[in-house]
Swiss-Prot record:
This is Spermatid nuclear transition protein 3. Involved in nuclear basic protein transition: histones are replaced by spermatid specific proteins which are themselves replaced by protamines in late spermatids. It comes from the Eukaryota. Keywords: Chromosome, Developmental protein, Differentiation, DNA-binding, Nucleosome core, Nucleus, Spermatogenesis. InterPro entries: Spermatid_TP. It comes from Ovis aries. The lineage of its organism: Eukaryota, Metazoa, Chordata, Craniata, Vertebrata. GO terms for biological process: cell differentiation; spermatogenesis. GO terms for cellular component: nucleosome; nucleus.
Length: 110
């Protein structure tokens, strides 16, 4: 049996989304960085290390896409119109009741 050659172990690498800042400006995801004549994706690589107490920022394990915020669903026009009609009916009923009370009070005064 011959001895097999082993490949040297490489540290696990993790993709981080944003490139380093150049002149205080953050590169956006759709801008590409050129390395020589080859177009390379805008990703920097960091080695994953165990977190220490002094380390504040966590190294992301993967680049997550930003989630779109969902808008709350509004009731459709049919429900809106029904609610408006009911509100108007109750308002009219209340106004009629107040008017009839005023009429009764006016008749008592005379």
């Amino acid at each position: 049996m011959a001895k097999g050659t082993r490949k040297p172990r490489q540290p696990r690498r993790v993709a981080v989304r944003f490139a380093s800042r150049m002149k205080g400006r953050k590169k956006t995801l759709w801008q590409r960085r050129y390395r020589g004549s080859v177009k390379a994706p805008n990703m920097t690589m960091r080695v994953r290390r165990p977190l220490k107490g002094t380390l504040r920022k966590k190294i992301r394990s993967y680049a997550t896409p930003s989630k779109k915020v969902k808008n709350t669903r509004e009731p459709n026009c049919f429900l809106r119109s029904c609610a408006r009609e009911k509100l108007n009916q109750s308002r009219k009923r209340y106004q009629n009741m107040r008017q009839s009370q005023r009429r009764g009070q006016n008749q008592k005064r005379r």
